[in-house]
Amino acid sequence: MLHLLRSLTPNQRGAVIASYLGWTLDAFDFFIFVFVLKDVAQEFHTDVETVTYAILLTLAARPVGALLFGLAADRYGRRPVLMVDILLFSMLEFASGLAPSLTIFLILRLAFGVAMGGEWGVGAALAMETIPAGTRGVVSGILQTGYPSGYLLAAITYFALYGLIGWRGMFMIGVLPALLVLYIRGKVEESPAFLARAHAKFGAGLVKMLRSHAVRFLYAVLLMTAFNFLSHGTQDLYPAFLQLQHHFSQQTVGLIAIVYNFGAILGGLLFGALSQRIGRRRAIVIAALLTLPVIPVWAYGASPLTLAVGAFLMQFAVQGAWGVVPAHLNELSPEDMRGTFPGFAYQIGNLLASANATLQAGIAEANGGNYGFALATVAAIVAVTLAVLAHFGIEAHGVNFAGARVDPNDGSIRS
């Protein structure tokens, strides 16, 4: 794996770093909220289930951002659109910490969702179109580990600073990702595949996607719905589960979150690289099925140590499956709409899974506050569903980007 990364040119490494950090910091801004659900509920004199509507709104708005920023990236380029998007979600995160009421807070989280939705598709397209085809599996795992890396940063911030700055200060720290724009501006060039076909008409890719690639797009949406239910169903309410059902302290919750995000990072790296050898679908199936024997320890463990071990293994498997996604979706994407197709399919899946936190909170309340039961039920059903969809789905492992115009070995444009 390391020799593949060393083979990248400075510009290719810059694109990978920018895309990884963009997704890391986007996820950091999102996951700050899951650690302070209870605090926000207390601040605005409501319950946790009501506050989870902010998560629903954020996830539901992400397809809008994926579509708008994706279309803009297909028209104006990946690099400038990525910079605008990062600035926007950073500013909205800061503003969330200033919200004077629950209504304003919900509106800001809705707007944040639009900005959050734009980052993944644009960043992944920039990286995948810049690197050699033979490194896609490894880089895919790296890019997707940005998500648990962001969660890990949020957990560390919560553990170290929450007692000093409170929930509002946690959100205000979320403005720091804006500094990444300076790195992109100075170190990252535009995707060579985009430059080879620049100046496409704005919105043309969407029409073609819906007309000519409807079946492939619908499959990608179904696949990403299962992926998002699995991810959000094992992550978003886990801190609340530890706080409300097990009554663990802030420090204990933060430490467990740090542990399971290390598992997520390792899983994403391993399965991303593995998918280059055994194929995208097979890697997804193996990782999804690995979650099933872990569920009893992850959801029904009694001690902090047992739950930490279960959570580590669960996120190793969940994010292992996710480590394949950037390469898989970009390879499935039609050539002239790679800025739009992967991110839009991903975020439509997010929209369809956006009620997960509210659904799980409702199941828990209906069962006497048993969050473990709610988490286990959703995780088991969705893991099997994902494995079936991946097994019987389609794959375009190793497909060349930009036809004959981009060299698959070094990413350079060919005439």
Regions found by a protein language model. Give the residues of each.
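Cytoplasmic helix-loop-helix junction between adjacent transmembrane helices
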Residues: 108-145
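Cytosolic juxtamembrane N-terminal segment immediately preceding the first transmembrane helix
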Residues: 1-28
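Extracellular/periplasmic helix-loop-helix junction of adjacent transmembrane segments
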Residues: 34-64, 251
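C-terminal transmembrane helical hairpin of 12-TM major facilitator-type secondary transporters
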Residues: 275, 281-325
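Helix-loop-helix hairpin linking two adjacent transmembrane segments in secondary transporters
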Residues: 143-186
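Helix-breaking motifs and short loop linkers at transmembrane-helix boundaries and internal kinks
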Residues: 45, 77, 98-104, 132, ...
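Extracytoplasmic gate region of multi-pass secondary transporters
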Residues: 34, 214-265, 353-357
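Conserved MFS/SLC helix-loop-helix module at the cytosolic interface between two early adjacent transmembrane helices
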Residues: 64-100, 278
